[in-house]
Amino acid sequence: MKKDFKLNVNFPWGKYFKENKIIYKILLILVVFMVLLFNSTHIIAELQWFQEVGYTRTYLTRALAVAGLTLPIFLIFFTISILYYKSIAKKYDLVAYPKKTPKEIKTRNRFVYIAAGIFFLIVSYGLARDNWYIILQYFNSVDFMEVDPIFMKDISFYVFRLPFYQLLISMSLSVVVLLIVLTVFIYLGIAAKSSINRLNFRNLQGILHVIKSGFIQFAGKALAMLIALYMLLLALKYYMDAYLLMFNESGVVYGPGFTDVRVHMPFLRAMAVLAALSSLVVAYGILKRKVKFIAYPVVLIFALGLVRVFVGLGVEALVVNPNQLERERMYIANNITMTRQAFGIDNVDIRIFEANQDISPQEIRANQHVVDSIKVNSYRHTLDFIKQAQVIRGYYDFNDVDVDRYMIHGEKKQVFLSAREIDHKAITPATWQNIHLFYTHGYGVIMSDPSTVTSQGQPDFLMKDIPVTNTTDIPLDNPRIYFGEMVSDYVIVGTETEEFDHPKGGENETYRYTGDAGISLGFFNKLLYAIEEKEPKILISSLINEDSKIIRRRNVVARVKAIAPFLSYDEDPYLVIANGQVYWMIDAYTITNRYPNARTFGGINYIANSVKVTVDAYNGDV
């Protein structure tokens, strides 16, 4: 017979939880332990990796920046909240729970302190982790020595300092709003537990009575302080919003136009002044329980905001649009000048070359080296042919073709280059041992001459095959590729099993890694990376010994991004052969979308190719 489930409201829940308190404490300790374990293993693994690549200082700078920012943010948030809670909790207890014992109040306060501490620690860490670079930029900013055409401020103000001010204002507003909401909820709790106020919201008089006799009486001073602070922060926000018009995209130009400069900027400054003055008026109204002093400033700011919108629309329609080119001429010129300046094309030397179709045989003979280097092959078609002719085994692949120039037999020639990498997705069977211990690296480089073809009309290979057949005088002593564009998984070298090196006829040549890359796998590190990689085989496999090393972050772009995340990288590294080794070269850029008055392309409006990065394909050195 089916029975309906009913909750036993008479069950002694309090006694049950009290008797089983030790179980919940153990569960809480286990949860905290697991969280700390996984976070600490990640931190240690990251630190070891940065030590391996020689960039410990970079990691520590970031880690110390996050930790150094988390602490003050936490202390500010936590201290303000707890002090405010203490000031308001006394009234709450007197009215809502007059019979509560000091012990009960102490227990509740302890819970509030712990909960608030955990909450604000998580929030503070999140803010520090997501904004550490903004804060470091602010404290390490350098002037551009160039100014914007409207406010005449150095460009560094917009790139480095304005984001920091916005962050401070945003965080402060969030805390103040949180405290105001907390005050309202505490008051509603009191109103529900006592006769201080019956919450009559049926008419305007009832609402005014609730505000004047209940809410303000309960939290008048605290609320006055919070509202005043909120209005001051709002004033700062309006003041900073005027600078944000330098990034306005709604007009005919990127940045401020006629209406922005003549209407929106003055209105925003007026609203900032009004909000600052209103902070005092609203605070006075709360303390004196005069609702009109609270309402009028708020209504006035809102009304001024509406007037700004309608005046802006009117000026745009009646003043600008009928004579747009004349009105916007200066601002269009500003936009063009700042865009050229931002992208470094303001001093371009323009030269006109007249094309001459009448080329004589004498001119051809005089420029034979130019004619000989004319490309007859496309890199796309060359890649297709390489994949057909040079993959050799199904577990190899070529990601792309790069173009470079080399001195070959005393002559500078343009060449196509492509690296033969291991494709882990194509390995069969895809066992853990095959992917991480056996198939550890690619092998060889294909070099072709784009200006010639074979007698069959195919690309002319200068380097090809396994082992590498090299018809150039460019030495390639080590063709092994442990770091590349296609790889992403970790590998473990120096194990009890030999690594696959390359096929040789019907057999496989094996190899043991002799480079410097990798982190030694003693017992502690085996346990550490078993947790970090979520792979218990790292700990229990009998193939891993004390001489084994784990090599991580083998994708060259991911590798350099981890070292310097504040740069933007070209996603297409190009291959270089030098000193008998294979290297990857990556262009790195400093970018921003905060260059004032400059048009954006692809989400940015400033770029500089400030850094060239090389990665050793064998050792992973950066």
Give names to the regions the model predicted.
Residues K3-N20, I26-I29, F33-V622:
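Soluble extracytoplasmic regions of secretory-pathway and membrane proteins
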